[in-house]
Regions:
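N-terminal segments that cap or nucleate solenoid repeat domains
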Residues: 5-48
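Structural marker of alpha-solenoid helical repeat scaffolds
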Residues: 34, 105, 139, 172-173
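Terminal, low-structured helical/coil segments at or just beyond the last alpha-helical repeat
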Residues: 1-5, 148-180
């Protein structure tokens, strides 16, 4: 396949994702029409929408890389690739709405805060991601995933002491879970 044909195929895939969503998102939305009070389906929809946002973002980066022509840069000049990820924001925002619905229907549903943190991290909203991971750890102080991703958020925020603290917690939790 030529680079032009590949770029065209990626563009079509991105357009389809924006118009209908992924097959899994479509399936889950149909399921919610039948069972709008099913917290598990809402949770799965949130997961699928977050994944669709990441998938779209990956396609956008790949397309931008294909269209990037570093040979046009001056020698020694750094070139950056501009990627418009604005369309995937809709997936992330809809994922947050789905997770909020889970909290309304089943406040005790395990993992919601951690998943909300992942979405906020994808949105690059680090303060909200931090808040979600801290809530997840309040709910379950042995939540390895929340501890690990909280360490990443703190690293991205430049809070190295906190990043190390939560990375150590994640490592300890991982070792404990591996031993069991």
């Amino acid at each position: 396949m030529t680079p032009e044909a590949m770029a065209e195929a990626i563009t079509r895939q991105m357009e389809q994702m924006l118009s209908t969503g992924t097959d899994e998102v479509v399936r889950l939305k149909k399921e919610l029409e039948k069972s709008p009070q099913d917290a598990e389906v809402w949770f799965d929809l949130g997961l699928s929408l977050n994944q669709a946002g990441l998938q779209y973002e990956g396609l956008a980066v790949r397309l931008a890389e294909m269209r990037h022509e570093p040979e046009n840069a001056e020698e020694g000049e750094e070139t950056t690739i501009q990627v418009d990820v604005t369309p995937c924001l809709g997936f992330y925002k809809e994922a947050l709405e789905a997770f909020d619905r889970v909290r309304e229907l089943a406040p005790e549903y395990y993992g919601v805060e951690c998943q909300r943190g992942l979405v906020y991290a994808n949105l690059r909203d680090l303060p909200h991601a931090e808040e979600c991971y801290l809530k997840a750890l309040e709910e379950d102080e042995e939540d390895f995933t929340a501890a690990y991703y909280l360490s990443q958020v703190y690293r991205d925020m430049g809070k190295d002491d906190l990043a190390e603290k939560y990375q150590k917690l994640a490592d300890d939790l991982n070792a404990t879970n591996t031993d069991e």
